[in-house]
C-alpha cells in the first residue's frame, strides 16, 4: 500500500518505529523531506528546540511537539499534500498510546493525515480497548487469516528436506503468523548444519 501511494506526488509517507518517541520521530522525518523543509524555512518556523534546523531571527521557537506537528500539518494542508503514516508490529506501549492520542487531535482539526498500522490481533485488541483511544473501534480493520498449517509444513519440508514430524513441529511454532514463518525459516536456515530446532528456540522467542 505504502509503495503504491509513494508514486503519487500529492502524498507524503512516513514509517515510524513504535518502540521510539513517535511524535518526535514524525516531526524529524517530515522536517527532513526536502520539499517540506523549504516550506518551513520560508514560513520562518523555528523548530530548533527539538533539534530541527537552526534558530530563526525574529521568530519565537515552538516548544511543544504537538504544536510543531500542527504547524507542519497546517503547511502540508496548505500545499495540497496528504500524509500517510505507517506503523508495523504495533503494540500497546506508551509511545503508541501517546501518538494515537495526538493523532485523534489532528483528525479533529481536519488535517490531511492518515494512519496505517499492522500488528498481531492481540496487540491491536489491547490498544483499541484503551479508554482514551476509542476512535480505534471505529477505524477500518482488515483481519488477515493465518497461514495454512499444511502449506507452511510443506514449505519447510521442501526447502529444508525435513521429515513430516520435524516440519509439523516448526509449522506449529509459527501459529500461522507470516512474520513468524519467515523468522523461524531464516533462523533454521542459518543454523541448520550444527543446531536443532530446540537450539534456536531461545533466539526465535526473542523476535
How would you describe each model-predicted region?
Residues 161-207:
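Amphipathic alpha-helical "lid/sensor" segments that cap RecA-like P-loop NTPase cores
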Residues 139-167, 173, 184:
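Conserved small helical "lid"/interfacial subdomain of P-loop NTPases
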Residues 58-122, 129-132:
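Conserved Walker B catalytic segment
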Residues 13-22:
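A short hydrophobic beta-strand->loop->alpha-helix junction that borders the nucleotide-binding pocket
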Residues 1-12:
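P-loop NTPase Walker A phosphate-binding motif
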Residues 11, 129-146:
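A short helix-turn-beta junction within AAA+ P-loop NTPase domains corresponding to the substrate/partner-engaging
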Residues 30-72:
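Conserved Walker-type P-loop NTP-binding/catalytic site
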Residues 22-26, 123-128:
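Switch/connector loops and helix/strand junctions flanking conserved nucleotide-binding motifs
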Amino acid at each position: 500500500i505504502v509503495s503504491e501511494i509513494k508514486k503519487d506526488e500529492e502524498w507524503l509517507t512516513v514509517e515510524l518505529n513504535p518502540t521510539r518517541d513517535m511524535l518526535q520521530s514524525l516531526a524529524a522525518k517530515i522536517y527532513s523531506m526536502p520539499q517540506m523543509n523549504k516550506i518551513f524555512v520560508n514560513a520562518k518556523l523555528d523548530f530548533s528546540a527539538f533539534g530541527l534546523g537552526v534558530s530563526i531571527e525574529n521568530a519565537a521557537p515552538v516548544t511543544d511537539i504537538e504544536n510543531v506537528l500542527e504547524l507542519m500539518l497546517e503547511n502540508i494542508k496548505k500545499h495540497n499534500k496528504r500524509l500517510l503514516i505507517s506503523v508495523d508490529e504495533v503494540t500497546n506501549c506508551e509511545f503508541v498510546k501517546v501518538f494515537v492520542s495526538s493523532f485523534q487531535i489532528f483528525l479533529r482539526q481536519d488535517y490531511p493525515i492518515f494512519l496505517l498500522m499492522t500488528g498481531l490481533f492481540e496487540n491491536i485488541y489491547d490498544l483499541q480497548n484503551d479508554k482514551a483511544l476509542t476512535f480505534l473501534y471505529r477505524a477500518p480493520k482488515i483481519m488477515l487469516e493465518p497461514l495454512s498449517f499444511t502449506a507452511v509444513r510443506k514449505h519447510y519440508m521442501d526447502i529444508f528436506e525435513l521429515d513430516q514430524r520435524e516440519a509439523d513441529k516448526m509449522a506449529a511454532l509459527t501459529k500461522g503468523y507470516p512474520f513468524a514463518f519467515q523468522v523461524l525459516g531464516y533462523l533454521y536456515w542459518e543454523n541448520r548444519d550444527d543446531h536443532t530446532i530446540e537450539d534456536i528456540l531461545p533466539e526465535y522467542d526473542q523476535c
